[in-house]
Amino acid sequence: MKTLDMLKPGENAVITGINGQNTSLRRRLLDMGLTLNTKVSLVREAPFGDPIELEVRGYSLTIRKSDAQLIEVK
């Protein structure tokens, strides 16, 4: 299983699932546009690897690497 935090800058992927028991975090990720079958691209990582900047649906989104670990991609 590959997760969003495993992408390298410039790589693209498609979201296949969101894991985790925390429903408020899951809802927040969905509200930010991180839904199933959405194409995402890792733009860059912060100097120490956290957070990461994504391009989702034509806009930039920055999330924590710990949150990215919950998002399955292919």
What kind of feature is each model-predicted range?
Residues 5, 16, 71-73:
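Intrinsically disordered, low-complexity, charged/polar segments
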Residues 24-28:
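Short alpha-helix capping/helix-loop boundary micro-motifs
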Residues 46-74:
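C-terminal structural segments of small proteins and small subunits
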